[in-house]
């Protein structure tokens, strides 16, 4: 029964994808590069995300996909969701985490907004670490209808389990750009 319900939800959620905005972007940080994609509703609804990040100082990687729900409340957008993350830290074991969290975007004008989000996967929502933490905050400027620029700060860390050390995967400021269609 669960598989049938999940299949129906997946099919119904993709029926409205044509009415959603899509975005493909890249970020270059003080310690990392990141590629990301987003399929999101204009005001309210289900959104999908995907990203891959690499810390080029020592080769640490993380990547994943996410699903969430967004609600627009005038000048603010609130969202909550869950992700499936693959981690390949330099120290410790490769593994998966299923963080849950959310975020907010506060619009100062039609072109400029501030954003912040946080996700965590405590024990039971991951397999190789004790805890996974991800935080992202910054400012975005919609330069044109199809071009967005971002400046922000991103942090991803894991707390070790069973003798595995704590480890920071990403920690630093970044500049980014995205194409929307």
Regions inferred by a protein language model and the residue ranges of each:
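Residues that define the transmembrane beta-barrel architecture of outer-membrane proteins
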Residues: 29-35, 44, 59-65, 76, ...
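Residue-level signature of outer-membrane beta-barrel architecture
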Residues: 39-41, 69-71, 104-106, 141, ...
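Cleavable N-terminal export/targeting peptides
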Residues: 1-23
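Repeated loop/turn-to-beta-strand initiation elements of outer-membrane beta-barrel proteins
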Residues: 43-48, 73-80, 110-116, 141, ...
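Transmembrane beta-strands of outer-membrane beta-barrel pores
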Residues: 28-32, 41-43, 50-56, 71, ...
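Short glycine/proline- and aromatic-enriched beta-strand/turn motifs that initiate or cap beta-hairpins
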Residues: 17-69, 112, 176
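Membrane-embedded beta-strand positions of outer-membrane beta-barrel proteins
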Residues: 24-28, 48-50, 80-82, 102, ...
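Outer-membrane beta-barrel "beta-signal"
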Residues: 139-143, 168-181
């Amino acid at each position: 029964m669960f598989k049938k319900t999940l299949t129906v939800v997946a099919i119904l959620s993709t029926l409205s994808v044509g009415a959603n905005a899509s975005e493909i972007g890249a970020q270059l940080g003080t310690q990392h590069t990141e590629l990301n994609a987003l399929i999101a509703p204009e005001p309210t609804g289900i959104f999908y995300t995907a990203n891959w990040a690499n810390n080029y100082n020592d080769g640490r990687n993380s990547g994943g996909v996410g699903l969430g729900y967004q609600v627009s409340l005038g000048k603010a957008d609130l969202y909550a969701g869950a992700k499936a993350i693959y981690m390949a830290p330099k120290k410790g074991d490769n593994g998966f985490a299923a963080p849950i969290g959310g975020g907010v975007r506060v619009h100062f004008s039609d072109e400029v907004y501030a954003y912040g989000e946080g996700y965590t996967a405590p024990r039971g929502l991951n397999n190789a670490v004790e805890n996974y933490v991800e935080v992202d905050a910054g400012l975005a400027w919609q330069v044109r209808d199809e071009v967005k620029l971002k400046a922000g700060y991103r942090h991803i860390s894991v707390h070790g389990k069973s003798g595995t050390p704590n480890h920071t995967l990403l920690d630093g400021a970044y500049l980014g750009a995205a194409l929307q269609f």
